[in-house]
């Protein structure tokens, strides 16, 4: 059913593709279809078209087991992101954690005093950099006490953030493997980024994985308006950016597979991303991208493909 809906929407969108021009001047935050892009300190900001986004997640702010935050290494870059994004009405969130920081979250979330320290540090950071909220990327809470601590942490952070601030989180693609995510979390956050990639060593993010991911989270109780479908701007197994793949062979890079230094790499090309946008328009509320510095430049940008398909 998901596949049928996605393809039908894609065909309808194709008929209108020729009418798509410059980015919509409508304020990004008021557009109903979310386009969430992760940005890292490695990004060259001048080549990213922020007007094609609704939200930017700046990655990463790192936690300590004590509940304190590690020294932030790119303050100038983040301030520049906020300046550029806010000029086009794009929201900016700080993403806290990321892969490999599970032990820190487990420890800090397990005690009320450490949670309070973490919450205050994040709220102060949001205020200092004039951010629009926080994205908590705990990969991943386990079932039982860990899950309960995650709920407590998110509830306390939500209560401490200023009114109108955004609070989001990221989850694994398959909800049946996410026992540590209590559905009560859905009542606390604004939306959830579903990381529908890294599903295998090779063809790691096909359309079928996206369909299965959204269906599984729907079954767990995550509402359509809170589901944001994650897509990769990189290939597996080599973790090669789409930009490098495109520069190596522009014609072949339009597909989903390419030989890169004699080794097959699998990724999402323009056609697959259009199909995923069509799927997200039916079964979710937007697209999330990991990550923007991996995109091709100018007219060959995958962000451009996503933005045009979303119109």
What would you call each of these model-derived segments?
Residues 1-7:
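Bacterial N-terminal signal peptides that target proteins for export
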Residues 27-126, 203-209, 215, 300:
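Glycan-recognition patch characteristic of GH18 chitinases/ENGases
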Residues 52-54, 185-191, 283-285:
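Glycine-enriched alpha-helix->loop->beta-strand junction motifs that scaffold or abut catalytic
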Residues 88, 129, 161-164, 283:
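Helix C-cap/helix->beta junction micro-motif
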